[in-house]
Amino acid sequence: MREMNLLVTSSLGVLLHLVVLCQADDDSELLVNTKSGKVMRTRIPVLSSHISAFLGIPFAEPPVGNMRFRRPEPKKPWSGVWNASTYPNNCQQYVDEQFPGFPGSEMWNPNREMSEDCLYLNIWVPSPRPKSATVMLWIYGGGFYSGSSTLDVYNGKYLAYTEEVVLVSLSYRVGAFGFLALHGSQEAPGNMGLLDQRMALQWVHDNIQFFGGDPKTVTLFGESAGRASVGMHILSPGSRDLFRRAILQSGSPNCPWASVSVAEGRRRAVELRRNLNCNLNSDEDLIQCLREKKPQELIDVEWNVLPFDSIFRFSFVPVIDGEFFPTSLESMLNAGNFKKTQILLGVNKDEGSFFLLYGAPGFSKDSESKISREDFMSGVKLSVPHANDLGLDAVTLQYTDWMDDNNGIKNRDGLDDIVGDHNVICPLMHFVNKYTKFGNGTYLYFFNHRASNLVWPEWMGVIHGYEIEFVFGLPLVKELNYTAEEEALSRRIMHYWATFAKTGNPNEPHSQESKWPLFTTKEQKFIDLNTEPIKVHQRLRVQMCVFWNQFLPKLLNATACDGELSSSGTSSSKGIIFYVLFSILYLIFY
C-alpha cells in the first residue's frame, strides 16, 4: 500500500512538473520584445488546437490631422506593453450598401470601427513558437477604395496552423486618404497607400524574427488591388529587398484600372476640390481645405471624379510618379527592371460578373440577367470607356455570336468575358509573359470551382475574389457547410501556397502526384484549380488576349486622330471596312 501511495505521489509530482513547464513555455510566448516595444499576444482556438495571435500592432504614426494625405511616418517606440489582443480600426472607406444585409456583399464591408488611425498589422504564429519559420504577408484588395485586414475571410489562423508559417496581414489607406495625388507636393504626393504597405514590410523585415519568422523568407500575396500592390512592389526599387517571393491572385500591376498618370491624378484631385467647394489658389489651399473636411464628406463624392461612366474603374489609385515607379510600368517590364524571383499567379473563371452587377444595365442578383442586345451594347461602352467607336465595334465583333446575337444568356456571358478579359486575365497574361523572360520560375493557375455554399446567383459563376476563402482555409470550418471535396481543395491550395513560399516551387519534391509545371513563354502551361485531379493546359485565353494586348491597342492608335471613323452615320460603314482591312493586315504581318 505504501509503495502504491509513493507511486501515486511520484506520478502527481511529475504531472505537476509538466504543468509548470508547459505554463512556463506558455508564459514565454505571452510577450514579444520588438524594436518598437513589448507586445502581448492573445491565444486563439484553431480547429482542435490553439495558435498565438498578435492583433493590431502599430507600424506607423496615425495619419491624422495634418498627416492626412502625407507619406507615413514610422511608429515611435512605446514604453510598457502593447496589448495586441483585439483587431484594429478599419481605414476610412466607401461602404457597399447596394444589397443591405446580403452576406455576399456584407462580407467585404468593414467589420470594425472606421478611423484614419488605422495603420496596424496582425500576426498569427504557430504554437509552440517556431525558430525560423517562413513568413507569408497578405495585402487585401478592394479597388484601392475599400478593404480591411480584419475581415473574417482573411483570418490567418487556419493557414498559419495547418502549414506552420508565420502569417501577417497589414492595413493601408485607401481612397483619397491613400491615393490623392498632387505631383510635386510633399503634402499629398500620391501613392501614400503603397508607402503604408512598404512601411509595414519594413517593420516585418526588422521585427518578424522576434515572432519566430525568418525575415529572409517573406512571401507577399494579395488579391485584386492587393495583388496589383504585390506586383507594384516587385517593380518598385524601394520595395524589392523587403521580400523574397510573390503570389498574385486575379491580376497584375499593369491592369488598366490600377494606375493613372500624374496629370490624371492631379485632375481628379482638382475635381474632388470642386465637388467640395474648396479654393484652388494653390495646392496648399486645396489640401488644407480637404483636411478640414470630415472623412465621410470625401468618401461621399469620390466617385464623381472619374472622367467617364465606366465599369471596373476606381477614383483614387496609384500614380506613375517617377519615384515609387521610376518609369512607366510597361517600360520597366520591357527592360526587366523589377525584382527577379519566383512568382505564382492566376485568375478566376468569371472575373467580370461581380462588376457587371454593380454597373451595367440589365444585370440583377435576383434573376438570370438575360441581356438584351441594346443592354449588351451599352455594357460594351461602359466596359471599354477609353475606346472610340471603331474600337467598340471591334470589341462587339469579337465577343458576339453572330449566329445567335439576340440570345440573352450569350450576351450576358459575353459581357462577363469582356470585363474579365480586359481588366484581369489579359493584363495578367501580358505581365506573366514579360516577367517570365527575366524571372526565376513562374507558376500559373486557373481557378474554376464555384463553392457549393456561394450565395451569389448561378449566372455569376466563379466570381472575382472567391478563391480567397480556399486560400485561407475556411472550408476546414464544419459550421460553414462546405463539402468534403472543398475541404480537400482548400488544404491542397494552402499547401501549394505555403510550399511555394518555402521553396519557390508549389510541388512537393518527392510527391507521386501530378506536377504543377513551370510556365514558359514558349509552352505557357497552367493548371486548373478545382476539386478534380490536376489537369495541365496551355495558352490561357490566348485568342482573346492577343485581341486585347496587341490588336485593339494598335487599332485605337491607328484611328486616334481620324475623327470620321469615330462619328456616326455613313462613317459607321467606313469604320467596319477599315476594321476588316486592318484585321487582314494584322493577321498577315503579326
UniProtKB/Swiss-Prot annotation:
GO terms for biological process: acetylcholine catabolic process in synaptic cleft; choline metabolic process. The active site is at 224 (acyl-ester intermediate), 351 (charge relay system), 464 (charge relay system). GO terms for cellular component: extracellular space; plasma membrane; side of membrane; synapse; synaptic cleft. InterPro entries: AB_hydrolase_fold (IPR029058), AChE-related_enzymes (IPR050654), Acylcholinesterase_fish/snake (IPR000908), CarbesteraseB (IPR002018), Carboxylesterase_B_AS (IPR019826), Carboxylesterase_B_CS (IPR019819), Cholinesterase (IPR000997). SUPFAM superfamilies: alpha/beta-Hydrolases. Keywords: Cell membrane, Disulfide bond, Glycoprotein, GPI-anchor, Hydrolase, Lipoprotein, Membrane, Neurotransmitter degradation, Serine esterase, Signal, Synapse. Disulfide bonds join 91-118, 278-289, 426-545. It comes from the Eukaryota. The keyword rRNA-binding does not apply. Glycans are attached at residues 83, 440, 481, 557. Transmembrane segments: none annotated. Found in the synapses and to a lower extent in extrajunctional areas of muscle and nerve, and on erythrocyte membranes. A lipid is attached at residue 567 (GPI-anchor amidated serine). It catalyses: acetylcholine + H2O = choline + acetate + H(+). Residues 568-590 form a propeptide. Residues 1-24 form the signal peptide. An interchain disulfide bond is present in what becomes position 596 of the T isoform. It holds the Pfam family COesterase. Its EC number is 3.1.1.7. GO terms for molecular function: acetylcholinesterase activity. The keyword Chaperone does not apply. Isoform H form is a homodimer; the asymmetric form is a disulfide-bonded oligomer composed of a collagenic subunit (Q) and a variable number of T catalytic subunits. Belongs to the type-B carboxylesterase/lipase family. Terminates signal transduction at the neuromuscular junction by rapid hydrolysis of the acetylcholine released into the synaptic cleft. May be involved in cell-cell interactions. This is Acetylcholinesterase. It comes from Torpedo marmorata (Marbled electric ray).
